[in-house]
Amino acid sequence: MTIAFQLAVFALIATSSILLISVPVVFASPDGWSSNKNVVFSGTSLWIGLVFLVGILNSLIS
């Protein structure tokens, strides 16, 4: 169970880092938002899911 928690935390950190860089780039590009809207929403949904997964796994470990 600890390995799953560590992998979920790593995935959350990696997703956060990717979104931290990619979202401003999408908003700064001239036609970025209209062409990359689905990618931003998918990344945000993945991030929210990982936050809940880390919370659930943390409650099971502690």
From Swiss-Prot:
An example Gene Ontology CC term for this record: chloroplast thylakoid membrane
InterPro entries in UniProt: PSII_PsbZ, PSII_PsbZ_sf
Subcellular location: Plastid, Chloroplast thylakoid membrane
Record has Cytoplasm as a keyword: no
Kinase recorded as keyword: no
Keyword vocabulary terms for this entry: Chloroplast, Membrane, Photosynthesis, Photosystem II, Plastid, Reaction center, Thylakoid, Transmembrane, Transmembrane helix
Record GO biological process: photosynthesis; photosystem II stabilization
Pfam families registered for this protein in UniProt: Ycf9
Membrane topology of this protein: Multi-pass membrane protein
Transmembrane segments annotated in the record for this chain: 8-28, 41-61
Gene3D superfamilies given in the database record: Photosystem II PsbZ, reaction centre (1.10.287.740)
PANTHER family per the UniProt record, alphabetical: PHOTOSYSTEM II REACTION CENTER PROTEIN Z (PTHR34971:SF2)
Quaternary organization: PSII is composed of 1 copy each of membrane proteins PsbA, PsbB, PsbC, PsbD, PsbE, PsbF, PsbH, PsbI, PsbJ, PsbK, PsbL, PsbM, PsbT, PsbY, PsbZ, Psb30/Ycf12, at least 3 peripheral proteins of the oxygen-evolving complex and a large number of cofactors. It forms dimeric complexes.
Similarity remark: Belongs to the PsbZ family.
Function: May control the interaction of photosystem II (PSII) cores with the light-harvesting antenna, regulates electron flow through the 2 photosystem reaction centers. PSII is a light-driven water plastoquinone oxidoreductase, using light energy to abstract electrons from H(2)O, generating a proton gradient subsequently used for ATP formation.
Protein name (Swiss-Prot/TrEMBL): Photosystem II reaction center protein Z
Organism of origin: Citrus sinensis
